[in-house]
Amino acid sequence: MTAKPPPPIPPTLGGDDSGTHGPKLAPEIPRINSELAAQAALRGQQLLRKQGSQEQHATNTLPAHKTGAPPPLPPTQSRPVPAIPARGASDRAAPPEIPPKRHSLKSMPDGQPMMVPGLPPTMRQPPPLPRKPASTQSSAQNSAQSSPLAGMKFKDKPPPPPEKHSTLSAEGMAARRCSNPFEMPPPPPPLVLQSAVAALSEQSSKNGLNPVPSPAPTRASEAKKINQRSIASPTEEFGSEDALRGIESGLRNMERAMQEQMNLRNMEAAVQNNFDLSFKASLAAGARHLGGGSVNLRTANYERNLSLDEGRAGDSRQSLEELKQLRAQAQQQSLLNNSSSSSSNSQVEQSMRSTIEHHMRSLDRNLPLELQYSRHRFQNNLNAVAAAGGGGGNSSTGNAVANSGTSGSQQPPMPLSSEFREQIRQQLLGNIPPQVVHNMGQSPGSAAAAALLQHQAQSRAAAAAAAAAAAAAAAQVAAGSGALSREELRMRRRSSHDETQLTQNSSGGIQVTRLREHWDETSQCVLQRAAQLKNMLSDSQRFEAKRLELEKWLARMEQRAERMGTIATTADILEAQQKEQKSFHAELHQNKQHFDIFNELTQKLIAVYPNDDTTRIKKMTEVINQRYANLNSGVINRGKQLHAAVHSLQSFDRAMDQFLAFLSETETLCENAESDIERNPLMFKDLQSEIETHRVVYDRLDGTGRKLLGSLTSQEDAVMLQRRLDEMNQRWNNLKSKSIAIRNRLESNSEHWNALLLSLRELTEWVIRKDTELSTLGLGPVRGDAVSLQKQLDDHKAFRRQLEDKRPIVESNLTSGRQYIANEAAVSDTSDTEANHDSDSRYMSAEEQSRELTRSIRREVGKLSEQWNNLIDRSDNWKHRLDEYMTKMRQFQKILEDLSSRVALAEQTKTSWLPPSSVGEANEQMQQLQRLRDKMTTASALLDDCNEQQSFFTANQVLVPTPCLSKLEDLNTRMKLLQIAMDERQKVLCQAGAQQTHENGDDGRTTSNSGTIGPLPNLGQSVKPPWERATTAANVPYYIDHERETTHWDHPEMIELMKGLADLNEIRFSAYRTAMKLRSVQKRLALDRISMSTACESFDRHGLRAQNDKLIDIPDMTTVLHSLYVTIDKIDLTLMLDLAINWILNVYDSQRTGQIRVLSFKVGLVLLCKGHLEEKYRYLFRLVADTDRRADQRRLGLLLHDCIQVPRQLGEVAAFGGSNIEPSVRSCLEQAGISQEAIDGNQDISIELQHFLGWLQHEPQSLVWLPVLHRLAAAEAAKHQAKCNICKEYPIVGFRYRCLKCFNFDMCQKCFFFGRNAKNHKLTHPMHEYCTTTTSTEDVRDFTRALKNKFKSRKYFKKHPRVGYLPVQSVLEGDALESPAPSPQHTTHQLQNDMHSRLEMYASRLAQVEYGGTGSNSTPDSDDEHQLIAQYCQALPGTSNGSAPKSPVQVMAAMDAEQREELEAIIRDLEEENANLQAEYQQLCSKEQSGMPEDSNGMQHSSSSMTGLSGQGEQGQDMMAEAKLLRQHKGRLEARMQILEDHNRQLEAQLQRLRQLLDEPNGGGSSATSSGLPSAPGSALNSKPNTLQTRSVTASQLNTDSPAKMNQQNGHYEHNSKNSSGLVTVITEQELESINDDLEDSSSSNTTNTTTTTTTTATTEKTCVELQK
């Protein structure tokens, strides 16, 4: 509940009184705060001194004291008045801006006196004012002027006139302060200032400050009427501080001031009345001695000049000084005349003074500090009074008046600006309630002051009689004084805060009385409002407490309601929910009374406080009531739902029993109806209607039962309910079948079934028409643009919609026909013609007609069913075909766009070619050309794809859009031009490089040594005569044996090394055999002396970081290897570099393209260098991981492919899963916890490092050779203090194998590798492998395990074989992942222009013919069976469902189906080409014989030796050149035929391998797959001994596959048992001529070779068919 906001503050209107003095003072007011405490102390000291003089004077008799001295105050008081504490600048709070209240001030005409009814006009002059002692006034003035504030603010101003003492009430003082801002405020009561000075002195003593001197204040009072408060002189200064501060703090200060006045009321009453009588009588007596005319005129003029107009400020100050002098003289005269007054007058005056000072002290609290003590700066006469009160209180009054007049003339009163006065007035009048009635037009502030004084006047009722005695004297004084004008009164009232000041001669009595009334009324209103606010606060607090309580309770109940959940379906849960609902509802009902109380509080606030804003209360109450209503309605609805659920559950059992009884009764009726159906057909109709009626009951019971079955928690109840439901369903279905059968029998008349037959025939015709329409829609070519395809899809949707509309009718007729023929006996399905031919329908019996009808219906049902199914299938196929065309067309257009951008980029690169100026630039441009070739290789693949897509569209009668065809044709042309341009560019660069090399006299090779440690050695010195090292255009080294005149890709040392590795083939187990071979290679290449950290640093130093997908050529590889080998001492650097390059090219670049991937280069070196095994695993994973340190399937496949190439080079790849890396990737992903569905779905999945390491710790089959290599290296120097039980070797060096079944049986590694056995030991026994010396703990452990194994039977070991590695099944797996070629993502270079490459291509097959080195069962040189299958899988086009072959059988079948026609076409082309060549050769021979018969013998001789034609003529030379070309062409043809024969042999070998795999039993899968031995996690060449002690080995579980034999032509292995001795021969021109005759002889056998190839292909087809079966 909030109170209404106060009205806004109206802007202050500036009048004429904004003179020159106002703007100077207003900004300086905030800066005088530091002087306020000092001013308060001065004022307090003055009052204390005055009080001391009064107390001293009170002890004497009244006639004894001097005239003009103030009457003494009572020596003691019953209760001390609290002092006003002095505040400093830091304690003062800035007064808030108080909005003004509307008030009216009635202005009076300027210059006219205000006439008060009942009072005589003011015509007399007031008595003269008593003069203060000069010393007192001067000391006060000096004290005030000594302040820096006083000197700053009141410089160059006249001194104020002498202050006139008067007895003013609190209302008069406040009114006078507000009406005259030029006057200084009066001093506070002495008791208050005494307390203030005491407090200030105590604080000063605490702070170490000197006490402030306290001047003695003096105040003169004038007599007034009885019941009226005297009005202060206009010379009195304005204001005190606490008026605004009290308003700022609110009603609290006012109540405190009123409480203090109530406490002092009893003491003040008598003293105040006596003081008023004596003081006012003396004023009246003194007034009679004053002269009338001039003084009254001057006083009236002064009163008229007291307006707030700043233009008349100077005249007003002059009049003020004169008036003060006159009044001081009059007061002095009156005091002299009244010297004989009684002592009671002194007591009355003292009482009145105490009361007035107390009121002033109360009102001073309500003003700010800036105004509370501002009067003391300008009231210089206070110093004189203080001096008089402290030292000589008996000084003459005349001197005091004279001194005060003198000091007052030095400094005039401070003028204030109109803005500042208006601000003070607004702040003083702000908090007065506007309801106060202003009878005389006074401001609200005056009414408040009058109300307060009225309350004080009631306490002085006892002094009313004494005050009446002095009324006459006061009336005479009032009659003698001049009246003020109405304009002056209006101006004074406008700037007043607490009370209105009138002159002494105005009718102030009536105004004061009204002020008292207004003050009482305002005080009463304020007190009422305060009480109302207290009550409002109390009610609001109760309301808020109740609201918070209810909101908390509602929130808890709402949460409880949300947790109730849905309605259950079981009895026990429903019962619990009902209890919960009832308790919830009961709690809602119990708390209803709290909401009633809350609503009562709300209504009370609204009714009791109608003038305040209660909108927020109403809204909060409505929200809470609405929440309660929602809760109540929700719980009632839930109760109804629970009741309905319970009722439904209870009625389910009854309904189930009733329905089962109905079924029993109906089944009995059906049995009876079957016999009596013909006599009483109406009985079946009633039965049928009853069954249809109970169909709804059955559906409801079945649905309810299923719901209950799903919600039951008890197993027994669920089983029982399931049985009842099954029984009900079965009996209902049987009843329906019986009903249908009876209905069919009733409807078995000819008309019904004839109508069914007719309907079936009509539907058949409709289906045939729709089939024809579908053929029309799908007939003809399909438009390949997107719009046409979308239109055809829309047509298909419309067509399918027609089929769906007809489907219910077709299925209904088919169902009826099948039911009819099912109930009839089986008859022959002869046609209608045959049936009519047998007999005429007119002579048929009813039984024969029924059989004929049945036969027709059966035939039509079968025909309609077949036609309908075919139509649906054709529609589905059309839809699938359109979707496929749409997808392929979009892909085709996308590839065209990509290809176009690639070709444009290549053409732009071509335009920037410049001729080379040096060898270095030629090499750099050659590298750029090579990169461009790589890019164009990808573009060529895309172009081939586009051409294949276009061929597919053409074959399927899909019209490709003309723009796409045009673009494809343009791209083909541009690609051919680019290829020609690149070939020409390569020739230019090669010629430039060769020319520069010849000029330099170099060996044909230039390298860049930047970034290496020292210059590169001359690698030509790596071989010794008769060998010579040469390089191709791609910097690929090859070696020439001048003794045998042959060339080799392998270094002579590498050939010897490979021959030496053949001796290790005697090792029985493939994992150890591979590890031994790799260890030999590692030592020969000195890679075991290069640490992995050195290799990684070298990679980074040469810029190979994050370049794994790029290519590295041989010069760069040489540079990196040189930086590694220079760190090793005592090696043949040139030989090591050549061997390392040779090994890496054999592993990763068998085609000798001269470039490999950076990833392959790094993997090949890291696998064989020295390092910790786990560190190698981590580094290998980092090579393929992305920025998030994760590797997907493709990256993992690339890594495993590069790793598997190492055993592949050694001919051991078949023992480790083959070249197919998909099973290993799948095994890794499954080990990482990825589901099989995610792997098969080709989702975007990846693994982290910990997954990869966890998989490798299980030692997978494809990488098991790597940890075995590390253990083998660690065991080379190990010596075991044991004796071999077979060869008796002691100590055992290397591996030590301890049998875990035979006690104290050890074997050395040699015996174990060769599979030797002892008498009692067998290969099936488990063994433990040690590569370091054993400990006693291990001995005890092995003995315990051996003891356990003694008690295990042979069946246990067969049932629990210990493979020792993680097997990977690869027989039934396809190559769905990327198995990159030797350079993935880059096609090998075509070195057609390289002489050595061409010679190698020709001679590789011719050498086989010459030496007969290859057998019929040899395998390919560069591919094993897995890689060949993988290549064919990638070459096969995708099937319609997008599934790739998963087994070798499927691969072979798909390969045969796709490649058969291609092979036959190649064979036919070769036969045709061979026939043409033979015909051309015969024609040439005939021409030569006819033209030169005498040289026929020479021609025959030339066929054997081309050197014999050197002396022939020009025509003979031409003929010889053509013959040479013909022979070369025949050689190429023969080589291609040989390749085809080799291809057929490859297929036969693969089929043989597949037959072996298919014939193997499932239990032998472990032996069919490869084998190896896993290592402990973290084993390495330099690992600690304790990491290599935990290997268990079973010899019978190890793979014993024989290794492939190496083909020495290119360093690869083949499965032929006999090594081939055929080498790559350099065929010169003379040698080609020498074998010409052999080629002529072999040309006649081309037809035979073709027949052999065809026969082999037929055999392959037959074998594939057998495998498929």
From Swiss-Prot:
Keyword match Isomerase: no
Compositionally biased region (Low complexity): 132-147, 328-347, 396-405, 1642-1660
Binding site residues for Zn(2+) 2: 1299, 1302, 1321, 1325
Zinc finger (ZZ-type): 1279-1335
Topology within the bilayer: Peripheral membrane protein
GO BP terms, alphabetized: actin cytoskeleton organization; establishment of cell polarity; imaginal disc-derived wing vein morphogenesis; imaginal disc-derived wing vein specification; maintenance of presynaptic active zone structure; muscle cell cellular homeostasis; muscle cell development; muscle organ development
Pfam families: EF-hand_2, EF-hand_3, Spectrin, ZZ
Phosphoserine modified-residue sites: 1379
Cellular compartments annotated: Cell membrane, Sarcolemma; Cytoplasm, Cytoskeleton
Annotated region described as Disordered, given as residue ranges: 1-28, 43-243, 327-356, 389-417, 481-508, 827-851, 994-1024, 1488-1516, 1559-1669
Keyword Transmembrane listed: no
Gene inactivation effect: Flies that have reduced expression of all isoforms (transgenic RNA interference targeting the common C-terminal region) exhibit severe muscle degeneration in larvae and adult flies. Muscles were either ruptured, absent or the fibers were detached from their attachment sites at tendon cells. These are necrotic, not apoptotic processes.
Keywords: Actin-binding, Calcium, Cell membrane, Cytoplasm, Cytoskeleton, Membrane, Metal-binding, Phosphoprotein, Repeat, Zinc, Zinc-finger
CDD domains assigned to the protein according to its UniProt record, in alphabetical order: EFh_DMD_like (cd16242), SPEC (cd00176), WW (cd00201), ZZ_dystrophin (cd02334)
InterPro entries, A to Z: EF-hand-dom_pair (IPR011992), EF-hand_dom_typ1 (IPR015153), EF-hand_dom_typ2 (IPR015154), KCMF1/Dystrophin (IPR050774), Spectrin/alpha-actinin (IPR018159), Spectrin_repeat (IPR002017), WW_dom (IPR001202), WW_dom_sf (IPR036020)
Tissues expressing the protein: Expressed in neuronally derived tissues, mainly the CNS and the brain of stage 16 embryos. Lower level expression is seen in the sensory organs. Expression is absent from the musculature. In larvae, expression is predominant throughout the neuropil and brain and in the eye antennal disks.
Ranges of compositional bias, category Basic and acidic residues: 153-166, 485-500
All residue ranges annotated as the WW domain in the record: 1021-1054
Biased composition (Polar residues): 53-62, 1497-1509, 1580-1611
SUPFAM superfamilies, per database record: EF-hand, RING/U-box, Spectrin repeat, WW domain
Residues binding Zn(2+) 1, per UniProt: 1284, 1287, 1308, 1311
Segments annotated as Spectrin repeats: 541-643, 650-747, 754-883, 890-990
Biased composition, class Acidic residues, residue ranges: 1630-1641
Function: Required for the maintenance of appropriate synaptic retrograde communication and the stabilization of muscle cell architecture or physiology. May play a role in anchoring the cytoskeleton to the plasma membrane.
Protein known as: Dystrophin, isoform B
Native species: Drosophila melanogaster
